[in-house]
Amino acid sequence: VNELPSQGKSNGFLEGLIELFAGFEDYRSPYAPTIQPPEELLKELVQNASFKSGLISATCSLPPGPLGILSILPELLMVYRIQGHLIMDIAALYGKEVQVTKELLLYCLFKHGGAHVFRKIIEESSFKILIRPTTVRVFQTVLEKLGIMISKSIIRKQFARWVPIGGAVVTGTFAYYDTKRVGNTAMELFSKEIHSDEIREMLESQ
């Protein structure tokens, strides 16, 4: 019964997520690269973003029943906006803000729950990240797979909305740790060398 409404909501959410990417292109991090990225500052950024995400998620989960359900998509978009800015700030501290693509943003946001979705476009090793060029169709396929993941998340949140206080604690805690995982993924990713497939082919041909 919940699948069809949730699928519709996830489609609307994906449209909102794509709009967020346009906003991220205009976002300029206030942080500048250093010779060695300051570990304390990175941890502070992740911690602050995690608390902010948790607070927003918990607050949006307080209204009970149908009113609370209406707040699910705005909540998700606000949390992903916080996480997206966190990714950009971490990239800036590593001096790699200009290398952030929509593929890398999605990878940081969803790797901990769906690394397999990115198998065709991102290859990660211990020391480097390789980004393969994507067609519109490939990127659309990735979004469709993420849509399934998001639908499951929306269904869980729907149940939580019927238990206002307990549900708020659960969703707030989940958003907190989810943002921490996103931050840790971004720190691990941007500490590596980032290459595109075109660059690799050029180097191999020399």
Regions found by a protein language model. Give the residues of each.
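Selective recognition of hydrophobic, aromatic-rich stretches within alpha-helical transmembrane segments
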Residues: 69-78, 174
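Terminal, membrane-proximal amphipathic helices
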Residues: 1-62, 81-206
